[in-house]
Curated annotation (Swiss-Prot):
It is an enzyme of class 2 (transferase). InterPro entries: AB_hydrolase_1, AB_hydrolase_fold, HAT_MetX-like. Substrate binds at residues 221, 355. It comes from the Bacteria. HAMAP family: MetX_acyltransf. Gene3D superfamilies: 1.10.1740.110, alpha/beta hydrolase (3.40.50.1820). This is Homoserine O-succinyltransferase. Residues 45-360 form the AB hydrolase-1 domain. GO terms for biological process: homoserine metabolic process; methionine biosynthetic process. The record marks 323 as: Important for acyl-CoA specificity.
Length: 381
């Protein structure tokens, strides 16, 4: 299947202030957006793809000045791909608080002319959805054919179906959860603590010091990567292999330098992440993850929380995902069925853990392709 090819982002400016769930107000903000495919005359073939923690608006294609800049879900979105851009108009939005061009901690605070830094207000999944709704309004899209996402993106898709039930025909929620477990909140807290305790953090105002809390970001990313992979996948990829060709005991360095392949992998991922991601953004997004809990306002009753939804749903999970285990997806399915909603559920047998939602797995992609075929028939795409 061909790639969507060269793409370019666009920046959308919004003058109307956005009141956040915290009570803070963001005024005169911008969101970076990419679109793929063509919006039909009826504006009925639009699909919103919501991104996860470290991703962005750049869902598919490449940038002209960097042929290596492949979109984070390029295997899913494009001509002839499961989400076929020959049939659908796909929108990717970089969320508020991110570090890829939308208004966030790195942006200039109009009141000071300096980066917001630690003063940027805490944002939630619900805040992102309200901001995304303004993007839809700007395109003249009254109703999405589908809102889709994996992991944190799946939480946004679910929130869309709750907050704007009349604007979502289908909700595709992959490798996600209705709320974080205590264990998941704990992982996020350890990652945040690594950043907050980095001497280069400077209370979140490190921009003025010309430094970046890279040590903390590295550790945060390493923690994340451990949770994204399954034990079996890590065993197959790395096992106990040493970086030295000779795996015998006498090949040990007897030091604390990198010796095992898994150590090398984690440090590589940590270094790469620390080079391109912003620490304040990491704090904001992980806290948004922690706060997401639509059932909280209903005394923990997810069935009651989903009572006013109108969409049809595809919920998908992966057998070896222990970060957001299949049981968490089944909680959503049960609550939807209790409300007599139309819901399809698939638990895909895949060895790759949580990261499976990003990978090119034939059974997974066939599932998504078949579901979008159904949507295409409904909207005449």
């Amino acid at each position: 299947m061909e790639s969507i090819g060269i793409v370019a982002p666009q920046t959308m400016h919004f003058a109307e202030p956005l009141r956040l769930q915290s009570g803070s107000v963001i005024g005169n903000y911008q969101l970076v957006v990419e679109t793929y495919g063509e919006l039909n005359a009826a504006r009925s073939n639009a699909v919103l793809v919501c991104h996860a923690l470290n991703a962005s608006h750049h869902v598919a294609g490449v940038y002209a000045d960097d042929p290596r800049s492949t979109g984070w879900w390029d295997n899913m979105v494009g001509p002839g791909k499961p989400l076929d851009t020959n049939r659908f108009f796909v929108i990717g939005v970089n969320n508020l608080g991110s570090c890829f061009g939308s208004t966030g901690p790195m942006s200039a605070d109009p009141s000071t002319g300096k980066p917001y830094g630690a003063s940027f207000p805490v944002v939630t999944v619900e805040d992102w959805v309200h901001a995304q709704a303004r993007v839809a309004d700007a395109f003249g899209i009254e109703r999405f054919a589908a809102v889709m996402g994996g992991s944190l993106g799946g939480m946004q898709a679910l929130a869309w179906s709750l907050m704007y039930p009349e604007r979502v025909a289908h909700c595709i929620d992959i490798a996600s959860t209705p709320k974080l477990s205590a264990q998941n909140i704990a992982f996020n807290e350890v990652a945040r603590s690594a950043i907050l305790s980095d001497p280069d953090f400077h209370g979140g105002d490190y921009y003025a010091h010309g430094v970046k809390p890279k040590r903390g970001l590295r550790v945060a990313r390493m923690i994340g990567h451990i949770t994204y992979l399954s034990d079996d996948d890590m065993a197959e990829k790395f096992g106990r292999a040493l970086r030295r060709a000779d795996g015998a005991l006498d090949a040990y360095n007897f030091s604390f330098d990198v010796e095992f392949e898994v150590e090398s992998y984690l440090r590589y991922q940590g270094d790469k992440f620390a080079d391109y991601f912003d620490a304040n953004t990491y704090l904001l997004i992980t806290r948004a993850l922690d706060y997401f809990d639509p059932a909280k306002a209903f005394d923990g009753n997810l069935t009651a929380a989903l009572a006013h939804t109108q969409a049809k749903y595809l919920i998908a999970s992966f057998s070896t995902d222990w970060r957001f285990a299949p049981a968490r997806s089944r909680e959503i399915v049960k609550a939807l069925l209790d409300n007599k909603r139309t819901v399809s559920y698939a638990e895909i047998d895949a060895p790759h853990g949580h990261d499976a939602f990003l990978l090119d797995d034939a059974r997974y992609h066939n599932l998504i392709r078949a579901y979008y075929e159904r949507i295409a028939n409904e909207v005449g795409a």
